[in-house]
């Protein structure tokens, strides 16, 4: 939440779509837009975000928006294409690739189907890890915390890269 697009405070689909559009204008064309925390249950109209809507607002970036529960993603058409997800792609065991009433992809991936997209995301760079660590430390200090620990040394592509980032930042 500290360095990615935080969608948890938005109270409507329109707000989320505008935030995604604005964020996309701050990054290089073609770079992934990754947002987290949308929750349609807090909106006046409890309807999820669909690929067609994301396509209208952000046509030149692949978009992946994680729902607050982490059990669903909203993905635009470019993101689905990068993951080679088509109308013929079978749902993986334990996952759902949602389609509309006409059998077309609607951009929602649930549970294990999310892995189809996660597998094509660019690897996290050491620079990104350093930026994330700096943001986390700054936030901890702001909250009055002076120490902490992590259990995620392998979360971002392996122990070595994460450890090197820690050594440089701390």
Regions found by a protein language model. Give the residues of each.
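Divalent metal-binding segments
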Residues: 1-170
């Amino acid at each position: 939440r500290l360095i990615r697009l935080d969608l948890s405070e938005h109270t409507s689909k329109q707000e989320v779509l505008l935030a995604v559009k604005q964020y996309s204008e701050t990054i290089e064309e073609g770079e992934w837009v990754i947002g987290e925390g949308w929750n349609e249950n807090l909106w006046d109209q409890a309807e999820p975000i669909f690929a067609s809507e994301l396509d209208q607002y952000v046509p030149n970036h692949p978009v992946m928006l994680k729902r607050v529960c982490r059990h669903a993603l909203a993905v635009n058409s470019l993101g689905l294409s990068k993951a080679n997800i088509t109308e013929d792609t079978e749902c993986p065991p334990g996952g759902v690739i949602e389609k509309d009433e006409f059998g077309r992809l609607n951009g929602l991936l649930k549970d294990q189907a999310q892995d189809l997209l996660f597998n094509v995301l660019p690897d996290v760079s050491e620079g990104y890890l350093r930026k994330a660590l700096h943001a986390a430390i700054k936030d901890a200090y702001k909250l009055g915390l002076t120490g902490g620990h992590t259990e995620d040394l392998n979360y971002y592509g392996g122990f070595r890269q994460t450890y090197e980032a820690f050594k440089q930042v701390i």
